[in-house]
Regions:
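Compositionally biased, charged N-terminal/linker segments
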Residues: 2-65, 75-78, 245-247
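Short beta-strand-centered aromatic/proline hotspots
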Residues: 82-84, 93-102
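Short, charged beta-turn/beta-strand-edge "cap" motif at the junction between a beta-strand
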Residues: 73-87
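Structural motif
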Residues: 67-69
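Short acidic alpha-helical/loop segments enriched in Asp/Glu that coordinate divalent cations
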Residues: 86-94, 108-114
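A general structural signal for short secondary-structure junctions and capping/turn motifs
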Residues: 22-26, 60-63, 86-90, 178, ...
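Eukaryotic short linear interaction motifs
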Residues: 79, 103-108
Length: 247
């Protein structure tokens, strides 16, 4: 009898201590959907083994939760990173879908993900590659631009909450700064499926039949089919590697 009572006490204590955790596990999660007009590998950035959304879409970045999924779909016309226009006249296709594994503020992102900072390119090549620095020192004709790194907001020392915007390959300037920072957070996705605009995935309507406006969120339980399909048929990461992708 004492053994049974002791067992019941242990179960009760465990339930009380873990009540908040159990509640969080039961919290509703969503799939956030939006249309993309640009796909330049900047927002989102699928490189270095993790997909990040650090700029654009401030409402999603501000209100999404860990465990939510985000997805970008084609508009009728989508610009790639070389400003080529790809047209989609027969409905939306999936450019990427990703599960949010971590949400962090900009200052933490700056320090923890230095590989995501924009890197200077000379004549299309990284400054760290052999020959590029020589071109600059010898005064040869060069063109300088930046890769698609999205970690572009550097915290200002001793001035909490202020950031300096770095030169970047995403086309973002000071006019975009307030819009980007209003999202408060950077979304980190360890599990992601990035098809890219050139290989955007056609999704059967039996798997996903929702119209995609500028932004829409749907309960995960209502879109389980498309997530299960993607997970079963593709490996997490950049799904199609080709010469268009800048690592």
């Amino acid at each position: 009898m004492k053994t049974v009572q002791r067992f019941c006490q242990i179960i009760y204590i465990f339930a009380v201590c873990n009540r908040s955790r159990i509640y969080r596990m039961g919290k509703d999660n969503y799939l956030h959907c939006y249309k993309m007009v640009w796909d330049t590998e900047f927002a989102p950035n699928p490189h270095h083994g993790v997909l990040t959304l650090a700029t654009c879409k401030p409402r999603i970045r501000k209100y999404a939760n860990v465990g939510d999924w985000i997805s970008g779909w084609t508009s009728v016309k989508v610009h790639d990173k070389n400003n080529r226009i790809i047209e989609f006249r027969n409905g939306e296709r999936l450019i990427y879908i990703a599960k949010i594994s971590k949400i962090i503020p900009f200052d933490q992102y700056w320090h923890e993900y230095p590989q995501k900072r924009p890197h200077e390119l000379i004549n299309g090549k990284s400054l760290t590659r052999k020959g590029c620095r020589c071109c600059r020192e010898e005064g040869k004709n060069i063109s300088i631009h930046y890769d698609c790194g999205d970690n572009i907001y550097k915290p200002v020392r001793n001035n909490s909450g202020k950031f300096v915007q770095l030169p970047n390959g995403g086309g973002h300037n000071e006019n975009d700064k307030d819009h980007d920072l209003s999202g408060k957070n950077v979304l980190i996705c360890n599990e992601f499926y990035y098809f890219g605009v050139h290989h955007a995935c056609k999704i059967d309507k039996q798997l996903f039949s929702y119209p995609i406006p500028r932004w829409k969120k749907i309960k995960l339980e209502d879109v389980a089919k498309i997530i299960n399909y993607i997970q079963s048929n593709y490996k997490s990461g950049i799904v199609v590697e080709n010469e268009d992708y800048t690592k």
